[in-house]
Amino acid sequence: MSDMHSLLIAAILGVVEGLTEFLPVSSTGHMIIVGHLLGFEGDTAKTFEVVIQLGSILAVVVMFWRRLFGLIGIHFGRPLQHEGESKGRLTLIHILLGMIPAVVLGLLFHDTIKSLFNPINVMYALVVGGLLLIAAECLKPKEPRAPGLDDMTYRQAFMIGCFQCLALWPGFSRSGATISGGMLMGVSRYAASEFSFLLAVPMMMGATALDLYKSWGFLTSGDIPMFAVGFITAFVVALIAIKTFLQLIKRISFIPFAIYRFIVAAAVYVVFF
């Protein structure tokens, strides 16, 4: 593979990763399809995907840095609160409660989960995840009990964490699972999305660090330019995608995302079967 060709592949996959990582559409499903069409598969490809995920995570850190610092007691200017009177504040405990279920299951069944990474499982996960998005829109309370992040209870945070366990199924979408779970628990669509992004930082950093540790041997110095291009591209695109997504969900429901998931599932079937 020539240098220019590999850099082009890195840029394309960086765009795909950045666009889909935090949208409820399954970045895994998209990466599998695009990677296959580009002929970029195997151990190096898997390590590359792990590295560019770090770029997407960095975008969340940049977007929510004040809130993240606030979780550990460091405030810049006026403390962040939902407009109007708040029942409390989002704390580090909320994040920890949201992490515990998936962390426990992920550590216990890490190898089993990795063995599920194949097109057929991803295809089914895309469909089921789409159905969950539709269910969340149809069954959510008419008036959210937690309109803002600072209105969330510990119970809601923990239940969102339980829904996050569904994302251990490759192709389900971590953001899709957590946002749907939040809406079903009475959290507003916007606040559930924000919480999903905040929860992604420790969850994805932990999972990425573990994957990178296990695949470190596949890295070579010659991969650095390609990995750097993918990382930077994923970061920039994810930053734009998150900002756009948070504006978009103020105006539309998640039904279009569910329909799109069904289309991607059909694409997986056409490409691989």
Swiss-Prot record:
Membrane topology: Multi-pass membrane protein
Catalytic activity of the protein: di-trans,octa-cis-undecaprenyl diphosphate + H2O = di-trans,octa-cis-undecaprenyl phosphate + phosphate + H(+)
EC number from the UniProt entry: 3.6.1.27
Database matches in InterPro entries: UppP
Enzyme class: hydrolase
Stretches that traverse the bilayer: 6-26, 45-65, 90-110, 116-136, 190-210, 222-242, 252-272
Cellular component GO terms held in the UniProt record: plasma membrane
GO biological process assignments: cell wall organization; peptidoglycan biosynthetic process; peptidoglycan metabolic process; regulation of cell shape; response to antibiotic
Keyword set, alphabetical order: Antibiotic resistance, Cell inner membrane, Cell membrane, Cell shape, Cell wall biogenesis/degradation, Hydrolase, Membrane, Peptidoglycan synthesis, Transmembrane, Transmembrane helix
GO MF annotation: an example: undecaprenyl-diphosphatase activity
Record-linked Pfam families: BacA
Principal subcellular localization: membrane
Compartment(s) where it occurs, according to its Swiss-Prot or TrEMBL record: Cell inner membrane
Family from the record: Belongs to the UppP family.
Role played: Catalyzes the dephosphorylation of undecaprenyl diphosphate (UPP). Confers resistance to bacitracin.
Note: Bacitracin is thought to be involved in the inhibition of peptidoglycan synthesis by sequestering undecaprenyl diphosphate, thereby reducing the pool of lipid carrier available.
PANTHER family hit by this protein: UNDECAPRENYL-DIPHOSPHATASE
Name used for this protein in its record: Undecaprenyl-diphosphatase
Species whose genome carries this gene: Escherichia coli (strain K12)
Gene: uppP
